[in-house]
Amino acid sequence: MDEVEMVMDILNESRKVRAATHNILAYRVSRPDGTFYQDHDDDGETAAGGRLLRLLVLADARNVVVVVSRWYGGVHLGPARFHVINTAAKVALESLGEIHQST
């Protein structure tokens, strides 16, 4: 979607965002017929974008783009990284009132 590319262009104006090891993205936009435009991008963090999108679906979040930036600091987090990434997204969505179902 053009709007998602525009959001990423704006975010990439930040040196910090550009320097992130991964900018994991998911979006979910409602359509007039009740279906959704939705997709994700792992940005090299295998399976992370899909997990973010699953969070958006479970939360029934609508008309949102979520980007979680991750900087590799030398410590391998293993599977725990998915919990950290989704928790960051969930906190952001909750602060905006975008959690409409229990996740």
Where would I find each of the regions flagged by the language model?
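Generic secondary-structure microfeatures
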Residues: R28-D33, L56, R70-W71
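C-terminal regulatory domains involved in ligand/effector binding and gene-expression control
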Residues: M1-T46, E94-Q101
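Solvent-exposed alpha-helical segments within well-ordered globular domains of core cellular machineries
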Residues: M6-D9, R54, T87
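Active-site-proximal loop/helix of nucleotide/amide-processing enzymes and allied scaffolds
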Residues: G49, V68-T103
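Phosphate-backbone binding interfaces of nucleic-acid-interacting proteins
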Residues: N63-V64
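Short glycine-rich, acidic/polar surface loops and turns
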Residues: G49-L58
